[in-house]
């Protein structure tokens, strides 16, 4: 995983481990996630591993009629982090407007990340709503309305106070040492020294709220939203004699891009959600599933390429274009539902580290995905609602079928998602802050297990 992404995710874990603060994934996009910036949510977002947003080139102020702008933003405080990528934290000392985190190893001792939070003051937002309406003929606004896209406004941003060079030395992701990985050809990818310079004012994390657009160019950014709310709600018919406000002349319908899993965040809901998406993938022809597995196998371990594929599918769906998978004897045309399902699983896979993606390739080759899936599923099923850390016994038969090499791969795969498996016992250490990581791993394993199982069956039939 890129150092910048390591930093932003670690920052969110420290500041807001179970809240709605979203880490920024791309350093190059930081200027487009400042307060008042407009962003779009990815098509297949889910609460189970967090919603993700993509930049636009506009701010809310760009869409409003000319007028005065808020003079400043509210500064919610300053925070200082030392050795932030360390896995184990020795102590946490709080003083007014300052938080210092001391760790054990990982970053160079000179690296201290100082951040501040900037947010839109409620009073400034209310004044803006009263004084400036939306510009009715703005091309971007009309384009989003035509495509029925939901727009979100960045309401709070965490930014770097000073330029800092963050150096990651050794393995800052794993929660235990894995010297045996060198024998598996993975040690180089896990222990590279990397560094990134974060400029002053760089946004590292942010919070968003939904923009609502009404008749007569009125707008709002409600504090509380539900999954049926849209930026451009449909207008309902009312009697001519009736007096009704612009905000009442709407008919809310569930949005197509709603946040999956928004109502009940438990393992049963996650499992049902994953099953719905795998059922759509199962509808592909045997050749289509085999082709999808081949394509993913080539991309696993190349996170940038996976993200590029995700953007390609998103763009095709937005433009109503058809997408095909390259396969023999002929290409396979993907339906809209199939593309939606593939986007869901791509979202899960891109949450994993590059190291995990490479381990998945090895696991595919060794045909141990069913064991790994069962391990993650069993752990989530037992602990999903567990809010306290703890060490719990592991069913001995879960890993009994694995040899030494397969066991090392499995320990590394789940360990990089924050689940520490201890052979003595056997037992595992549960940390509720890693739940989202394990949910993404569960979804990714579910897809690859389905595709490899179907592919093996196809191969067997062909040989029979």
From Swiss-Prot:
Where expressed (tissues)?
Highest levels in skin with weak expression in placenta and testis. Not detected in the gastrointestinal tract. In skin, expressed in postnatal hair follicles and epidermis as well as sebaceous gland basal cells.
Residues that span the membrane, as ranges: 78-95, 99-120, 164-180, 184-198
Protease as a keyword of this entry, yes or no, is: no
Effect on the protein of changing residue 348 to D? Spontaneous pyroptosis-inducing activity
Positions bound to a cardiolipin: 9-13
Q: Name one GO molecular function term.
A: wide pore channel activity
Similarity comment: Belongs to the gasdermin family.
The name of this protein is: Gasdermin-A3
Q: Which organism is it from?
A: Mus musculus (Mouse)
Q: What is the lineage of its organism?
A: Eukaryota, Metazoa, Chordata, Craniata, Vertebrata
């Amino acid at each position: 995983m890129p150092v910048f992404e390591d930093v932003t995710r670690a920052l969110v874990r420290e500041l807001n481990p179970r809240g709605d603060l979203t880490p920024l994934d791309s350093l190059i996009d930081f200027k487009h996630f400042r307060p008042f910036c407009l962003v779009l949510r990815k098509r297949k977002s889910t609460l189970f591993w967090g919603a993700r947003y993509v930049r636009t080139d506009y701010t809310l102020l760009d869409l409003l009629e000319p007028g005065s702008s808020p003079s400043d933003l509210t500064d919610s405080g300053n925070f200082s982090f030392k050795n932030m990528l360390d896995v184990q934290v020795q102590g946490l000392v709080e003083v007014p407007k300052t938080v210092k985190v001391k760790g054990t190893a990982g970053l160079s001792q000179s690296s201290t990340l100082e951040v501040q939070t900037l947010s839109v003051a409620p009073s400034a937002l209310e004044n803006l709503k009263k004084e400036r309406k939306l510009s009715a003929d703005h091309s971007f606004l009309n384009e989003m309305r035509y495509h029925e896209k939901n727009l979100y406004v960045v309401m709070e941003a965490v930014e770097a106070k000073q330029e800092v060079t963050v150096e990651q030395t050794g393995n800052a992701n794993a929660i235990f040492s894995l010297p045996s990985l060198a024998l598996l050809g993975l040690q180089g990818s896990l222990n590279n020294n990397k560094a990134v310079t974060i400029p002053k004012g760089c946004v590292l994390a942010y919070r968003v709220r939904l923009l609502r657009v009404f008749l007569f160019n009125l707008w709002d950014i409600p504090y509380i939203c539900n999954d049926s709310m849209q930026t451009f709600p449909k207008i309902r018919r009312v009697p001519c004699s009736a007096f009704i406000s612009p905000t009442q002349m709407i008919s809310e319908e569930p949005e197509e891009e709603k946040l999956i899993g928004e109502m009940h965040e438990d393992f049963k809901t996650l499992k049902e959600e994953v099953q719905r998406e795998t059922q759509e993938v199962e509808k592909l022809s045997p050749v289509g599933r085999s082709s999808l597995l081949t394509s993913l196998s080539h991309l696993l371990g190349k996170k940038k390429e996976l993200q590029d594929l995700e953007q390609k599918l998103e763009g095709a769906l937005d433009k109503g274009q058809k997408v095909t998978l390259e396969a023999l004897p002929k290409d396979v045309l993907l339906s809209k539902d199939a593309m939606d399902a593939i986007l869901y699983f791509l979202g899960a896979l891109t949450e994993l580290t590059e190291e995990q993606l490479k381990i998945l390739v090895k696991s595919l080759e060794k045909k141990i995905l069913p064991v790994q899936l069962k391990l993650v599923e069993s752990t989530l099923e037992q602990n999903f609602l567990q809010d306290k850390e703890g060490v719990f016994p592991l069913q001995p038969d879960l890993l009994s079928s694995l040899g030494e090499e397969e066991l090392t791969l499995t320990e590394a795969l789940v360990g990089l998602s924050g689940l520490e498996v201890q052979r003595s016992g056997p037992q595992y250490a549960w940390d509720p802050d890693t739940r989202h990581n394990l949910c993404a791993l569960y979804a990714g394993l579910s897809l690859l297990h389905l595709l490899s199982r179907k592919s093996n069956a196809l191969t067997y039939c062909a040989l029979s």
